[in-house]
A protein has these predicted regions:
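Membrane-interacting alpha-helical segments
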Residues: 2-6, 10-17, 21
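Active-site and donor-binding regions of nucleotide-sugar-utilizing enzymes
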Residues: 15, 19-212, 217, 224, ...
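Low-complexity, intrinsically disordered or signal/transmembrane-proximal segments
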Residues: 230, 236-237
Length: 242
């Protein structure tokens, strides 16, 4: 409840700031146009895998996995969303995704509308992306949802006595692929055990550029993680070679 009240205040703040700041104006316009883009481009007969990155740095962290999926599973389409203009404006013509747009503001209504329209079979949130309404509705709809290259610190609200209610947002994820052992320890401390330590996927991108990467650690962990976490309420998807 408090989160949703804050979101609406943030929404009004963005609207006002957009009158004076070009970057904020682009973000505000892009978020409002997201549904228009999706209505025009979503193929109702296709199966989409959704990647969300806040900005350019997070995009680079998710890019190795995105490109591996596109190569090995061409039957799936890729939807890529950004929060920041610094990501969207640079990568809006990226050929590795079928649809690219801003992520709508995290209201419950937007989340419901977005997921009904896209109907993703799987979702990946890169690093620090913990949007409560989207994540809770993804969980409600039994859509496997993964946090990639996430990293946690002990001073974050999730791990404080007063923030345990917000830690429920983290429990919406099917599995975490974290950067270090400390992040795994912190998550396990609040009862989240579906965690793999895979490092920073940006290093895979560097190796990929140098043509030295033959395997992506996150893909191997993903394959193992999905195999060990299948249950009756989690749809199975044919990602067998990860």
């Amino acid at each position: 409840m408090i989160y949703n009240i804050v979101i609406y205040f943030v929404l009004w703040g963005i609207a006002i700031a957009s009158l004076f700041n070009e970057k904020v104006r682009k973000m505000w316009r892009g978020e409002r146009e997201a549904f228009k883009i999706l209505k025009q481009k979503v193929d109702p007969n296709a199966k989409y895998i959704w990647f969300h990155a806040a900005s350019l740095g997070e995009f680079e962290q998710g890019r190795p996995l995105m490109e591996r999926i596109r190569k090995d599973y061409p039957q799936y389409k890729i939807l890529l969303t950004f929060y920041s203009p610094s990501g969207y404006e640079v990568r809006k013509n990226y050929e590795g995704a079928d649809i690219i747009c801003y992520m709508p503001v995290d209201t419950r209504l937007n989340a419901i509308r977005f997921l009904r329209l896209v109907r993703p079979v799987m979702a990946f949130f890169i690093k620090y992306e913990f949007w409560s309404n989207f994540l809770h509705i993804l969980k409600y709809r039994n859509i496997p949802t993964y946090s990639v290259s996430s990293i946690f610190r002990e001073d974050q609200v999730f791990f404080k006595w007063y923030g345990r209610s917000y830690a429920g947002v983290l429990k919406c994820f099917t599995r975490f692929f974290v950067q270090n052992e400390e992040s795994k320890r912190l998550l396990e401390g609040i009862g989240i055990t579906a965690v793999d330590v895979v490092g920073d996927t940006r290093f895979d991108r560097v190796l990929q550029i140098k043509e030295a990467a033959k395997h992506l650690p996150i893909c191997e962990a993903f394959r193992t993680g999905v195999a060990s976490s299948q249950s009756a309420d989690v749809p199975h998807h044919d990602f067998k070679v990860f």
